[in-house]
């Protein structure tokens, strides 16, 4: 009986995972051409049809994925310092090479 419950649970989770992509509507923003002047020709009534995030996109200036990636790549959070401190001891290959260069 327990094995049957486990199988039913796994089946339900698998169906929920695979069906999630089918019920989400595709955004028309993905089909729009990207580029610096591509979004200038959009009319206000067209922006309302893009979805619930269109109001926020209008306030942000309709940045496309390349601009968002560029903005995010400029930002480094405090987690970068934590990762460097936590994993600094793993950098033994570079350190041993530097030590070998310093010896006469």
From Swiss-Prot:
<feature type="modified residue" description="Phenylalanine amide">
    <location>
        <position position="92"/>
    </location>
</feature>
<dbReference type="GO" id="GO:0007186">
    <property type="term" value="P:G protein-coupled receptor signaling pathway"/>
</dbReference>
<comment type="similarity">
    <text>Belongs to the gastrin/cholecystokinin family.</text>
</comment>
<dbReference type="InterPro" id="IPR001651">
    <property type="entry name" value="Gastrin/CCK"/>
</dbReference>
<feature type="propeptide">
    <location>
        <begin position="22"/>
        <end position="58"/>
    </location>
</feature>
<dbReference type="GO" id="GO:0005615">
    <property type="term" value="C:extracellular space"/>
</dbReference>
<keyword id="KW-0372">Hormone</keyword>
<feature type="modified residue" description="Sulfotyrosine">
    <location>
        <position position="87"/>
    </location>
</feature>
<dbReference type="InterPro" id="IPR013152">
    <property type="entry name" value="Gastrin/cholecystokinin_CS"/>
</dbReference>
<keyword id="KW-0873">Pyrrolidone carboxylic acid</keyword>
<protein>
    <recommendedName>
        <fullName>Gastrin</fullName>
    </recommendedName>
</protein>
<comment type="function">
    <text>Gastrin stimulates the stomach mucosa to produce and secrete hydrochloric acid and the pancreas to secrete its digestive enzymes. It also stimulates smooth muscle contraction and increases blood circulation and water secretion in the stomach and intestine.</text>
</comment>
<dbReference type="Pfam" id="PF00918">
    <property type="entry name" value="Gastrin"/>
</dbReference>
<dbReference type="GO" id="GO:0032094">
    <property type="term" value="P:response to food"/>
</dbReference>
<feature type="propeptide">
    <location>
        <begin position="96"/>
        <end position="104"/>
    </location>
</feature>
<feature type="modified residue" description="Pyrrolidone carboxylic acid">
    <location>
        <position position="59"/>
    </location>
</feature>
<keyword id="KW-0964">Secreted</keyword>
<feature type="region of interest" description="Disordered">
    <location>
        <begin position="22"/>
        <end position="70"/>
    </location>
</feature>
<keyword id="KW-0165">Cleavage on pair of basic residues</keyword>
<feature type="signal peptide">
    <location>
        <begin position="1"/>
        <end position="21"/>
    </location>
</feature>
<keyword id="KW-0732">Signal</keyword>
<keyword id="KW-0597">Phosphoprotein</keyword>
<dbReference type="GO" id="GO:0005179">
    <property type="term" value="F:hormone activity"/>
</dbReference>
<feature type="modified residue" description="Pyrrolidone carboxylic acid">
    <location>
        <position position="76"/>
    </location>
</feature>
<keyword id="KW-0765">Sulfation</keyword>
<dbReference type="InterPro" id="IPR039236">
    <property type="entry name" value="GAST"/>
</dbReference>
<feature type="modified residue" description="Phosphoserine">
    <location>
        <position position="96"/>
    </location>
</feature>
<keyword id="KW-0027">Amidation</keyword>
